[in-house]
Amino acid sequence: MENIHDLWDRVLAEIEQKISKPSFETWLKSTKAHSLRGDTLVIVAPNEFARDWLDSRYSHLIAETIYTITGEELAVKFIIPPNQDDEELEFQSSKKKQRKPYEETNDFPQSMLNPKYTFDTFVIGSGNRFAHAASLAVAEAPAKAYNPLFIYGGVGLGKTHLMHAIGHYVIEHNPSAKVVYLSSEKFTNEFINAIRDNRPDDFRNKYRNVDVLLIDDIQFLAGKEQTQEEFFHTFNTLHEESKQIVISSDRPPKEIPTLEDRLRSRFEWGLITDITPPDLETRIAILRKKAKAEGFDIPNEVMLYIANQIDSNIRELEGALIRVVAYSSLINKEITADLAAEALKDIIPSAKPKVITIQDIQRVVGQHFNIKMEDFKAKKRTKSVAFPRQIAMYLSRELTDCSLPKIGDEFGGRDHTTVIHAHEKISKLLQTDTQLQRHIQEIQEKLKQL
C-alpha cells in the first residue's frame, strides 16, 4: 500500500468532490493520517467534538472511498491529539476483509446503500418532483415502469439520494432481490482489477446477475473505451433479462463527451429526467427535515437566513447547517442569525453576484440585434430572428442553471432538442467565427453591467 499520508491526501481529494464545502472545511480539512495499525487506518481529528462527528457520520463514506482507491477494506479509527495514550481510546471498527473487489459476496448489494437516503427522508420540491415520481414508480415496479431511468442534474441536488431510495424500497418489499449500487469510477476500477488478475468472468457474473443496478456519475465513463464496452454488454444483458437499470449523471446523455453513440442511444431508451436547484420554500423544508433528523433545535429565523444565503444545492445547504451547529457547540453560544452569519462568513461572499436570468439574456440579445422580446418566443425562422434566438439559447445554457426543458419553455415552448442543437451550433461556430466571438463578448459585457 502507498504511504498513508499520500493515501489520506487522495481520500480527502475524493471526498471533497462528494460533500459540501462547509462540511469538508469544518470536519475533514484539518484531519491528518496518523498510522496504519493492522487493518485500521488511524486519523487525527482536531478535537473531541469533531472526532465523534466524523466517527458517527463519515466512517462509511471514508471506508468506501479507501476501498475505491485501494481495493482494500480498512476500518477507520479517529483519535484526538493525544494528551493520553490513544491506544486507550475506544472507537468503532470493523475487520478488513481479504478479498478481490470483484469477488462475489453475500452482503455486497445492501452494504453500499446509505441508510439515511430513503424516500421518507427526501424533500420534494418543484425542482425534483418529476424525478422523485419517476424514481418511486421504478422502485414500485422494477423494469416495468421506465428502464433505464436516467437522472441528471448538478452536484448535491439529490440524484444519489433517489438512487439509494430506490434500492432501499426494492429490498424492503423484496428482501431476496439483488440490488447493487456503485459509482462508474468504482465499476471502472473493479473492471481494471479483474482484467489485471485475469478474472473477467467473476466481474461479469457479479454485475450481470442482479435485479437492480444503480450506477452513479456515469459521465466518468467518458473516454474510457474498454470500460464503455464492458458496461454496454452489462447493460444489454440486464435489459434483455428485464432487470432494472438506474443511471445518474451531471448532464443529459447527449451532452456527455466521448460517450459511444450505442451507449447514448440505450440511455435514451427509457426515461430521462432532471433535477434543478431547490427554491426557497424547498430549501427551508430541507433544513427543517435535516434539523429534525439530527436532533438540532434551530430557530426559524436561522433556517430562513441559511436558506437565503445558500441556494446552490442541498449538500451545501445541509453543510452550512452543520457548520452553524458545530460553531455554536464549540464556542458554547446560543444559535442565532448573528451567530450563523459569523459561522458562515468564510463561505458566503460579502456581496452575492447578480443571478442572470433567461429574460435578462433575451433582453440584452434583443437590444444587441434589434429584435423584440416576443420574437424569441415566436415561430419566425428568418435568419435575422433565428440566429439571435440561437445565441440567446446558447447563453442561457452557459450562464444559467436552468434545465433544457426550462430553457425551451422560455423560448416559446420549444423542445429541449432545439436548445441542444442551438448550443452545439453556436459552440462550433465560436471556434472559427471571429465576428460571432465579438457579438458574444459584447453581450456578456452588457450582462455583467446589469
Swiss-Prot record:
It comes from the Bacteria. Residues 1-84 are annotated as: Domain I, interacts with DnaA modulators. Residues 84-111 are annotated as: Domain II. Its main location: cytoplasm. SMART domains: AAA, Bac_DnaA_C. One of its GO terms (cellular component) is cytoplasm. It is found in: Cytoplasm. GO terms for biological process: DNA replication initiation; regulation of DNA replication. Pfam families: Bac_DnaA (PF00308), Bac_DnaA_C (PF08299), DnaA_N (PF11638). ATP binds at residues 156, 158-160. GO terms for molecular function: ATP binding; ATP hydrolysis activity; DNA replication origin binding; lipid binding. Residues 329-450 are annotated as: Domain IV, binds dsDNA. CDD domains: AAA (cd00009), Bac_DnaA_C (cd06571). Residues 112-328 are annotated as: Domain III, AAA+ region. Keywords: ATP-binding, Cytoplasm, DNA replication, DNA-binding, Lipid-binding, Nucleotide-binding. The keyword ATP-binding applies. Residues 89-108 are annotated as: Disordered. Plays an essential role in the initiation and regulation of chromosomal replication. ATP-DnaA binds to the origin of replication (oriC) to initiate formation of the DNA replication initiation complex once per cell cycle. Binds the DnaA box (a 9 base pair repeat at the origin) and separates the double-stranded (ds)DNA. Forms a right-handed helical filament on oriC DNA; dsDNA binds to the exterior of the filament while single-stranded (ss)DNA is stabiized in the filament's interior. Oligomerizes as a right-handed, spiral filament on DNA at oriC. Domain I is involved in oligomerization and binding regulators, domain II is flexibile and of varying length in different bacteria, domain III forms the AAA+ region, while domain IV binds dsDNA. HAMAP family: DnaA_bact. This is Chromosomal replication initiator protein DnaA. It comes from Geobacillus kaustophilus (strain HTA426). The lineage of its organism: Bacteria, Bacillati, Bacillota, Bacilli, Bacillales.
